[in-house]
Regions:
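Long, charged/polar, surface-exposed segments that mediate recognition or autoinhibition
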Residues: 67-101
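A short, surface-exposed interaction/processing loop segment used at functional sites
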Residues: 58-79, 155-169
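Charged/polar positions within long, soluble alpha-helices
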Residues: 96, 100-103, 129, 134
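Short amphipathic beta-strand/extended segments with alternating polar/hydrophobic composition
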Residues: 49-53, 71-80, 130-144
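Surface-exposed patches in mature extracellular/periplasmic domains of secreted proteins
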Residues: 102-112
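Surface-exposed, interaction-prone regions used to assemble/regulate multi-protein complexes
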Residues: 95-98, 109, 122-124
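A glycine-rich, hydrophobic loop/mini-helix early in the fold
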Residues: 31-37, 43-68
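Short, well-ordered, aromatic-rich surface patches in folded extracellular/luminal domains
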Residues: 1-39, 114-173
Length: 173
């Protein structure tokens, strides 16, 4: 994992970064304020990662490892994009309902990256705890899987980021 990617990932996983922000809402029985996914993807013989996170303020970010000098690509979104904000809010809401089905660690614990390409780690963060679960992406695409809504909303959010990026690229052309 490239350091620039790890830095952005760790920023989102450290709930202390939200301490001085007004309007944070803690959701569900475990009072989460951040949720997201991390995917491992094969790029030839190298594994690269994609990280999507949102918080209860409506902020969302997408980061991914790439071949640039910094090794990091990404975009920040949510504000001004109602569809993205709605999908991200649904992802956060579904994550809050699944914390009892996830592994639980003390807040500040290092979140393990997905085990292998094709695997997805879903996570939720509260002031006291880091919740996470890992599944093969093919499992999460099954509508009967308990984490399907969480994953499906993450994929919608990713799609809105892609659309946002495409609009930005065409506007700059």
């Amino acid at each position: 994992m490239k350091q620039s990617y790890a830095n952005m990932r760790n920023f989102w996983l450290d709930i202390k970064n939200l301490e001085n922000r007004k309007g944070i809402i803690e959701i569900g029985p475990d009072r989460i304020a951040v949720a997201g996914i991390e995917m491992a993807l094969a790029d030839g013989t190298v594994t690269k990662h994609l990280f999507l996170a949102t918080n209860s303020l409506g902020d969302s970010s997408l980061y991914f490892e790439n071949n640039s000098k910094s090794g990091l690509g990404g975009t920040i979104g949510g504000h001004g994009n109602e569809a993205l904000q709605t999908a991200a809010a649904h992802m956060l809401a579904h994550a809050s309902k699944l914390t009892a089905c996830m592994q639980c660690e003390p807040a500040g614990t290092m979140l393990p990256a997905p085990s292998n390409p094709g695997w997805v780690r879903l996570f939720a963060v509260s002031n006291e705890k880091l919740f996470h679960a890992e599944f093969e992406e093919t499992q999460l695409r099954d509508p009967q899987h308990p984490f399907y809504p969480f994953f499906a909303y993450s994929q919608q959010t990713l799609g809105f980021f892609r659309t946002q990026g495409a609009h930005t690229s065409s506007a700059q052309s």
